[in-house]
Amino acid sequence: MSIAVFDSGVGGISVLKSLVEVMPNEDFIYYGDSANAPYGTKTLEQVRALTCEHAKELILNQHAKGLVVACNTATSAAVRILREQYPDVPIVGIEPAVKPAMLFMENPRVLVMATPMTIREEKLKKLMDRYRHLGEIIPLPCPGLMNFVERGDLYGDDVRQYLEELLYSYSHDEIDAVVLGCTHYPFVRKMIQEVLGDRVRVFDGGNLSLIHISEPTRRTPI
């Protein structure tokens, strides 16, 4: 039996890589729904339906013993429902690294980059509200950014221009940290760092799922 890793495209590959490093003796199934990407500009109902459909395939037909929803948008839309539907299967989602970003210094000013749907959802709003007393949190929807990653355009002029326009006001402001709230965004992390400057700390929440998935699945024999 394998651990399934699901994402709306190629973004979750970075999460899969980390899982393989932590659990080298496990077998993994990766499913990237590039045919329906991007999820971040879809409605809640659309994302929920797609996520539940693919989870059903991976758990019931592919017999996955655990599921990592390696997509912030799908996590916000459906992970609670999936846990109710499959109570005996360890299911974890991805959470933007707001907590470590707010704790790395006193009174930080933190930019949270995410898809429009992730920004709208209550899950992220509640997470940000939990740490607002520690500093300033600025949510920034990034429509279209994951499309560059899906196309493999990680270093070209088009993605640089997109990021420069998106981040212009923040590259000249006192931003202390940026949270990459989508598993696609680490693929353009270097360019984000270049646009914002070296003084800005970049946080990626992709590894937060590893602790939660590793122990329960290790107790389930392959």
PLM regions with names:
Residues M1-S214, R218:
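Non-catalytic structural scaffold of enzyme domains
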